[in-house]
């Protein structure tokens, strides 16, 4: 198979049939974009500069915030360009790079949530050994493994995109590049590119979810063995924020997968809207979840803006 010699650009798509409303759709998406940047940026700033937050739990939270920022910064510039400027053209190289980062960061987010579940598991099940198990070095190693696993797992299918000829329509179905959209336009044998992502989905994302699920069964079993009701509530509260983030991420994954697999007769705009929800809702919600449910983050925000706060 030779290097791709077909036309060098793809055409991105906003909301088909709603082109006259693109400027209005741009406004809430821009607001969400700014909120995500501010929310996750604030979390990263707090964790970096507040010594009270220099603990494994918050280092993992910083990884989640950085991943969410990465997803947003990768997808939203082309979305806003399409909606406001009608800038639909994107080169093959830029498109494939965008697809690589979008899919890598999605797998990485699943890995970070698994790492956070491990942190919660150690906190509840082995509190006396917590500091000896989750040292700064160990946290760094976990972060590198999560990043490496995600980056290497996505690379094979994206590398192959550079070699496919594209002789069909060059119009993509979203305002950003996704692997599954691009391969539909290829005039070549795409069997590997169809099957490999399914393997990644089951071997990584689904496996991550199952490990998280069973770890929380063990956590719940430990918590239920605590005699005091107050201590049980305190122990559960330790992991409430993480549980909320897990639900936000995996529910959107399940909904998006369901729509793509079984929604053949669903209007295309529903597919597009669900994609935006999948990529924007978790990064938008995660900072709010941790700000509302975690007292240390609340205190850090109040200190950042020099507001008096109760120590109760």
From Swiss-Prot:
Its main location: membrane. GO terms for molecular function: G protein-coupled receptor activity; olfactory receptor activity. InterPro entries: GPCR_Rhodpsn_7TM, Olfact_rcpt, OR51/52/56-like. One of its GO terms (cellular component) is plasma membrane. Disulfide bonds join 95-187. This is Olfactory receptor 51B6. Gene3D superfamilies: Rhodopsin 7-helix transmembrane proteins. It comes from Homo sapiens (Human). Belongs to the G-protein coupled receptor 1 family. It is found in: Cell membrane. The gene is OR51B6. Odorant receptor. Keywords: Cell membrane, Disulfide bond, G-protein coupled receptor, Glycoprotein, Membrane, Olfaction, Receptor, Sensory transduction, Transducer, Transmembrane, Transmembrane helix.
């Amino acid at each position: 198979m030779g290097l791709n010699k077909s036309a060098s650009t793809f055409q991105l798509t906003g909301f088909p049939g709603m082109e006259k409303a693109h400027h209005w759709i741009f406004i809430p998406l821009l607001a969400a974009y700014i909120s995500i940047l501010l929310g996750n940026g604030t979390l990263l700033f707090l964790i970096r500069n507040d010594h009270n937050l220099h603990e494994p739990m918050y280092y993992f939270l910083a990884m989640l915030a950085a991943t969410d920022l990465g997803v947003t910064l990768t997808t939203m510039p082309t979305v806003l360009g399409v909606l406001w400027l009608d800038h639909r053209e994107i080169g093959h190289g830029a498109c494939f790079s965008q697809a690589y980062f979008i899919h890598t960061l999605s797998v990485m987010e699943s890995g970070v949530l698994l790492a956070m579940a491990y942190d919660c598991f150690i906190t509840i099940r082995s509190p006396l050994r917590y500091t000896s198990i989750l040292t700064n070095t160990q946290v760094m190693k976990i972060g590198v493994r999560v990043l490496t696993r995600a980056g290497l797992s996505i690379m094979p299918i994206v590398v192959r995109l550079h070699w496919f000829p594209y002789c069909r329509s060059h119009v993509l179905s979203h305002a950003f590049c996704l692997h599954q959209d691009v391969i539909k336009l290829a005039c070549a044998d795409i069997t590997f590119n169809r099957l490999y992502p399914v393997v990644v989905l089951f071997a990584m994302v689904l496996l991550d979810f199952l490990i998280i699920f069973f770890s929380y069964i063990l956590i719940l079993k430990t918590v239920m063995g605590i005699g005091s009701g107050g201590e049980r509530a305190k122990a559960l509260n330790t992991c409430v924020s993480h549980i909320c983030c897990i639900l936000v991420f995996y529910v959107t994954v399940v909904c998006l997968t369901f729509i793509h697999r079984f929604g053949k007769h669903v209007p295309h705009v529903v597919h597009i809207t669900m994609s935006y929800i999948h990529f924007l809702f978790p990064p938008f919600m995660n900072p709010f979840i941790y700000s509302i449910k975690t007292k240390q983050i609340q205190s850090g925000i109040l200190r950042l803006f020099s507001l008096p706060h109760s120590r109760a």
